[in-house]
């Protein structure tokens, strides 16, 4: 053994080829400070052994190296610039040391080689991957850029255009795509990976392969004609800004870094990368996006933990077909859990199966599936007009019409047809789980399972714990949601649960602005372009359906009359009474037509303005800051109330619920990250300015206390 540490081992193989193996004690290899130090020491040991003629890197895990240890980032990024600069320089000394070894080197890549893992393989002369490999630099998704030479080496290996596409998108690449652009040299079956890597090294040793020219190219300026470079970078800036927009600076920074470093050697190019990395690491966007990543890991960790307590789900059933039932059936079947889709009407079953088939056909068209896989998924969905096929289901998802009496009747009915230990859930957005539980003989096996529409696109599932729900029931539903490819968060029962409870105060703030004469289109523009929501409140209500919104608003008003009760008509009432239900009947706040691609197209409609003006009087203009304050303050305070009341367990889960369930702007990180960034004291002062607008604008005593102590929510957590 040449070198050994808890994360890396180096041994000598035949023909004096050294083998450096990443073998962390956890489930995956990642570059924390300890691993970087170990790699440095391992490379020193290799350099000191004059018998070594070549080096192969590999992994003992299912993935090569998944990236840097992101849990270290927030603390590290809070340090002074000089500390960050020193960290980057020290790490890059190690990667340069790997690249500068006096003999050929190769990476044998299996599974993920992302971020720092990708930067590791770029530092070797050759790269060979097996068919499981996924390679990429996802740092822009965290609001930063690669920091260990990724922006320097990748353009010199695969060309500037390809590198810009890889790094700005942050997507990982399949081995075939990586081979096509020259990021790797060969793709082999997993069992052939190490033999093929050793063969390449031996060919390099007898000069069949020129490793020295390859290495020199990586360390030299980019060979890009000046005019071509200007055109290439200018085009990239336009295309990337169109996708990333002004709220996400990292993708644009990538272009600037590669452009500035194009005519520099390795040392100069790395300095450009370091400076840009440090600047981005200090941004609120990076803090927010890294926070989301860490929150996502926390939620997934909880789901994994729940799996240990969960009842195994081998088969499922959904009651109620149609679009929602079809979406749930598709999601379950496509992730490997067979499901019965039961309805009382054949047309509804046809619609549900049609929805699943439509989603699968789209996957095939995009090349993400095959006709054979599509057929297998459809075979996993069993349509039924009676309960006979439901009897063996481990989990039942009731997804009938949103009406308490209908749901209660169906729940009581299905309980008679399933096994004693089958879990029963209700997909409801507004109806109390405790109320529905009364229809069951065994309420301990019941909880809520709230999917968001469209099911195949929305990552969140709210798992709602009723007062009688057992821990096993909740854990089993969390595990099932996770198996379906969803992100489950557990919330306690209350009107609106978590997501809708915090959404409707936002709509109330919007309605208040309209009552005071604001233009709904102007509000949408501010909330989309400035705050960063994917849809403004008027557009969102049209998509959700103003009939649905009207019903949910009434539920919220009944549940929280002091804050959400109404004394007169609001804009939602006006649209509902005029039977303007949104996209579903082509008229809401906006009017809708179908474009050439069959997608809904929205336009302004004079009728909407006439209806609102008749109820609320003449329009007047509002400043952007006031629009943002009056819509967001109620949502933020209600989110805090949910945490204080134990409806949601942590700031992390609340923020994930908002980002995944509502599309809260990721670059803001969620309500609690937004509050911490703004400063709780600053928020309290802002809310007090609008306190005269009513209970939704009244901050809690705990918020005032936290503000007085200069505290923050994530610091507490």
Curated annotation (Swiss-Prot):
Residues engaged in binding NAD(+): 324, 343, 400-402, 407, 429, 453
GO biological process: fatty acid beta-oxidation
Cited InterPro entries: 3-OHacyl-CoA_DH_CS (IPR006180), 3-OHacyl-CoA_DH_NAD-bd (IPR006176), 3HC_DH_C (IPR006108), 6-PGluconate_DH-like_C_sf (IPR008927), ClpP/crotonase-like_dom_sf (IPR029045), Enoyl-CoA_hyd/isom_CS (IPR018376), Enoyl-CoA_hydra/iso (IPR001753), FA_oxidation_alpha_subunit (IPR050136)
EC number of the protein: 4.2.1.17, 5.1.2.3, 5.3.3.8, 1.1.1.35
Highest rank taxon of the organism: Bacteria
Binding site for substrate: 296, 500, 660
Residues the UniProt record annotates as site (Important for catalytic activity): 119, 139
Signal peptide feature range: none
GO molecular function list: 3-hydroxybutyryl-CoA epimerase activity; delta(3)-delta(2)-enoyl-CoA isomerase activity; enoyl-CoA hydratase activity; long-chain-3-hydroxyacyl-CoA dehydrogenase activity; NAD+ binding
Keyword set, alphabetical order: Fatty acid metabolism, Isomerase, Lipid degradation, Lipid metabolism, Lyase, Multifunctional enzyme, NAD, Oxidoreductase
Region (Enoyl-CoA hydratase/isomerase): 1-189
UniProt-annotated catalytic positions: 450
GO cellular component: fatty acid beta-oxidation multienzyme complex
Pathway in which this enzyme or protein is active: Lipid metabolism; fatty acid beta-oxidation
Electron transport among keywords: no
CDD domains per the UniProt record, alphabetical: crotonase-like
Chain spans, region 3-hydroxyacyl-CoA dehydrogenase: 311-717
Keyword set includes Lyase: yes
Catalytic reactions of this protein: a (3S)-3-hydroxyacyl-CoA + NAD(+) = a 3-oxoacyl-CoA + NADH + H(+); a (3S)-3-hydroxyacyl-CoA = a (2E)-enoyl-CoA + H2O; a 4-saturated-(3S)-3-hydroxyacyl-CoA = a (3E)-enoyl-CoA + H2O; (3S)-3-hydroxybutanoyl-CoA = (3R)-3-hydroxybutanoyl-CoA
Oligomeric and partner information: Heterotetramer of two alpha chains (FadB) and two beta chains (FadA).
Physiological role: Involved in the aerobic and anaerobic degradation of long-chain fatty acids via beta-oxidation cycle. Catalyzes the formation of 3-oxoacyl-CoA from enoyl-CoA via L-3-hydroxyacyl-CoA. It can also use D-3-hydroxyacyl-CoA and cis-3-enoyl-CoA as substrate.
NCBIfam families xrefs: FadB (TIGR02437), PRK11730.1 (NF008727)
Family statement drawn from the similarity comment of this UniProt entry: In the N-terminal section; belongs to the enoyl-CoA hydratase/isomerase family.
Protein's UniProt name: Fatty acid oxidation complex subunit alpha
Protein's organism: Shewanella pealeana (strain ATCC 700345 / ANG-SQ1)
Lineage: Bacteria, Pseudomonadati, Pseudomonadota, Gammaproteobacteria, Alteromonadales
């Amino acid at each position: 053994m040449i070198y050994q540490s808890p994360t890396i081992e180096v041994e000598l193989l035949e023909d004096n080829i050294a083998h450096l193996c990443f073998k962390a004690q956890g489930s995956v290899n990642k570059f924390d400070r300890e691993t970087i130090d170990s790699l440095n020491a391992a490379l020193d040991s290799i350099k000191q052994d004059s018998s070594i003629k070549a080096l192969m890197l590999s992994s003992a895990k299912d993935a090569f190296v998944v990236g840097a240890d992101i849990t270290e980032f927030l603390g590290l990024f809070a340090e002074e610039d000089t500390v960050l600069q020193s960290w980057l320089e020290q790490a890059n000394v190690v990667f340069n040391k790997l690249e500068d070894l006096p003999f050929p080197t190769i990476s044998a890549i299996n599974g993920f080689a992302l971020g720092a893992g990708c930067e590791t393989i770029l530092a070797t002369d050759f790269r060979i991957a097996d068919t499981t490999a996924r390679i990429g630099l996802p740092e822009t998704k965290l609001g930063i850029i690669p920091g260990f030479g990724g922006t320097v080496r990748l353009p010199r290996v695969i060309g500037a255009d390809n590198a810009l596409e890889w790094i700005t998108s942050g997507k990982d690449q399949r081995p075939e795509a990586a081979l096509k652009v020259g990021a790797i040299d060969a793709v082999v079956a997993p069992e052939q990976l190490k033999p093929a890597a050793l063969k390449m090294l031996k060919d390099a040793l007898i000069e069949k392969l020129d490793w020295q020219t390859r290495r020199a190219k990586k360390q030299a300026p980019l060979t890009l004609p000046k005019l071509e470079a200007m055109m290439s970078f200018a085009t990239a800036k336009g295309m990337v800004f169109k996708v990333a927009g002004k709220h996400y600076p990292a993708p644009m920074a990538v272009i600037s870094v590669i452009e500035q470093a194009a005519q520099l050697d390795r040392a100069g190019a790395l300095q450009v990368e370091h400076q840009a990395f440090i600047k981005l690491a200090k941004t609120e966007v990076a803090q927010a996006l890294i926070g989301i990543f860490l929150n996502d890991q926390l939620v997934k960790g909880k789901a994994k933990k729940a799996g240990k307590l969960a009842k195994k789900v081998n088969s499922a059933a959904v009651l109620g077909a149609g679009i929602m039932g079809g979406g749930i059936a598709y999601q379950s079947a496509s992730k490997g859990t067979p499901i019965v889709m039961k309805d009382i009407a054949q047309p509804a079953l046809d619609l549900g199966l049609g929805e699943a088939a439509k989603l699968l056909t789209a996957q095939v068209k995009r090349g993400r599936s095959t006709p054979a896989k599509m057929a297998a998924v459809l075979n996993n969905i069993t349509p039924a007009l009676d309960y006979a096929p439901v009897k063996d289901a481990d989990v039942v998802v009731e997804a009938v019409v949103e009406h308490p009496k209908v749901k209660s009747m169906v729940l009581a009915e299905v309980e008679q047809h399933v096994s004693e230990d089958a879990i029963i859930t209700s997909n409801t957005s507004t109806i109390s789980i405790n109320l529905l539980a009364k229809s069951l003989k065994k309420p301990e096996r019941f909880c809520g399972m709230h999917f968001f529409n469209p099911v195949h696109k929305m990552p969140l599932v709210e798992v709602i714990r009723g007062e009688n729900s057992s821990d096993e029931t909740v854990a089993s539903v969390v595990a099932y949601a996770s198996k379906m490819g969803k992100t489950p968060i557990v919330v306690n029962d209350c009107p609106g649960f978590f997501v809708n409870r915090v959404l409707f105060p936002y709509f109330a703030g919007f309605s208040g602005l309209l009552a005071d004469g604001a233009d709904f289109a102007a509000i949408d523009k501010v909330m989309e372009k400035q705050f960063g929501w994917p849809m403004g409140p008027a557009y969102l209500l049209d998509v959700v359906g103003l009939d649905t919104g009207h019903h949910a608003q009434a539920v919220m008003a009944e549940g929280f009359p002091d804050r959400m009760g109404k004394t007169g008509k609001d804009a939602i009432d006006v649209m509902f009474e005029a039977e303007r239900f949104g996209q579903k009947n082509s008229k809401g706040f906006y009017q809708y037509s179908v474009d050439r691609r069959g997608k809904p197209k929205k336009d302004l409609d004079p009728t909407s303005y006439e209806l609102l003006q008749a109820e609320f009087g003449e329009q007047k203009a509002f400043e952007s800051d006031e629009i943002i304050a009056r819509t967001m303050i109620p949502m933020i305070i209600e989110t805090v109330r949910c945490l204080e009341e134990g409806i949601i367990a942590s700031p992390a889960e609340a923020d994930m619920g908002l980002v995944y369930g509502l599309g809260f702007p990721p670059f803001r990180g969620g309500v609690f990250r937004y509050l911490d960034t703004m400063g709780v004291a600053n928020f309290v002062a802002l809310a007090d300015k609008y306190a005269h607008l009513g209970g939704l604008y009244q901050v809690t005593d705990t918020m005032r206390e936290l503000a007085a102590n200069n505290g923050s929510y994530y610091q507490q957590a």
